[in-house]
From Swiss-Prot:
It is found in: Cytoplasm. Residues 47-236 form the BPL/LPL catalytic domain. The active site is at C190 (acyl-thioester intermediate). Substrate binds at R87, G88, G89, Q90, I91, T92, Y93, H94, A159, L160, G161, G172, V173, S174. The record marks K156 as: Lowers pKa of active site Cys. The lineage of its organism: Bacteria, Pseudomonadati, Pseudomonadota, Betaproteobacteria, Burkholderiales. GO terms for biological process: protein modification process. Catalyzes the transfer of endogenously produced octanoic acid from octanoyl-acyl-carrier-protein onto the lipoyl domains of lipoate-dependent enzymes. Lipoyl-ACP can also act as a substrate although octanoyl-ACP is likely to be the physiological substrate. One of its GO terms (molecular function) is lipoyl(octanoyl) transferase activity. It holds the Pfam family LplA-B_cat. It comes from Cupriavidus pinatubonensis (strain JMP 134 / LMG 1197). This is Octanoyltransferase. Belongs to the LipB family. HAMAP family: LipB (MF_00013).
Length: 253
């Protein structure tokens, strides 16, 4: 399978916090070279390397986490390869009509715990969905985002998986915009048998009076990137304020 290489759009930079984030729009890209590039970036980075968020759309591919069980691929499709990778989690599907955001962050520099990063990613997805009038929620013990209302209540709309290496993250989150959902029927998504998977268009998402379509995917991707940068900046600002408070001597009464 041959796909287009990284697009030339970007990078652009969010400078809301002490540690700015570069956002790279890579366009449609085959999974394996993108995965290789993430690992190479993480291995080569130094304490001065800027953090990045990559926005990507992949041709059809199943990815299986490092501890994943291949049995969760229920009905293999010779047209869709499966790639074993080093993120956490089980099996998921990537394909056209889905926004994928990879977070290449120095967690040590940001003083950010992995659980905090997962929470921030989920919050960014919730904020993005809310902008398109979709109500969603977290589920304890099941990373990702699920619809909380409507006929598809409980269906998964965003999947999340990370790898931490030397205090730096890669991999990230995928958000279904308007896509062929049939490949999800061939797997137990994220290892959960019978879990429904949905996209923003099927769920009735809309921006003002315009229903979500694949044509809005670039805007949705940028909105998600902005939300990710905003929640990370907000956490950084809170931590900085707490540090300043702790460093301020108490006044004698």
């Amino acid at each position: 399978m041959t796909g287009a290489g990284p697009a030339q759009a970007g990078p652009f930079r969010y400078t809301l916090a002490m540690h700015p984030i570069q956002v790279i729009e890579r366009g449609r890209e085959d999974y394996q070279p993108c995965f290789d590039a993430m690992r190479a970036f993480t291995v080569a980075r130094t304490p001065e390397t800027p953090d990045q968020v990559w926005l990507v759309e992949h041709p059809p591919v199943y990815t299986l986490g490092q501890a994943g069980d291949p049995a969760h691929l229920l009905a293999p499709d010779e047209r869709i390869p499966m790639v074993q990778i080093d993120r956490g989690g089980q099996i998921t599907y990537h394909g056209p009509g889905q926004v994928v955001a990879y977070l290449l962050l120095d967690l040590k520099r940001r003083k950010l715990m992995v659980r905090e990063l997962v929470n921030d990613i989920e919050q960014a997805v919730l904020d993005t969905l809310a902008a398109y009038n979709l109500a969603a929620e977290r589920k304890p013990g099941a990373p990702g985002i699920y619809l909380s209302d409507g006929p598809h209540r409980g269906a998964k709309i965003a999947a999340l998986g990370l790898k931490i290496r030397n205090g730096c993250s890669y991999h990230g989150v995928s958000l279904n915009v308007q896509m062929d959902l049939a490949p999800f029927l061939r797997i137990n998504p994220c290892g959960y048998a019978g879990l429904e998977t949905v996209d923003m268009a099927t769920a009735g998402g809309h921006w003002q009076d315009q229903p979500v379509t694949a044509a809005q995917q670039p805007d949705i991707a940028r909105r998600l990137a902005a939300a990710l940068c905003e929640v990370l900046a907000a956490r950084e600002a809170r931590a900085l304020a707490a540090d300043k408070t702790a460093a301020t001597p108490a006044l004698a009464s």
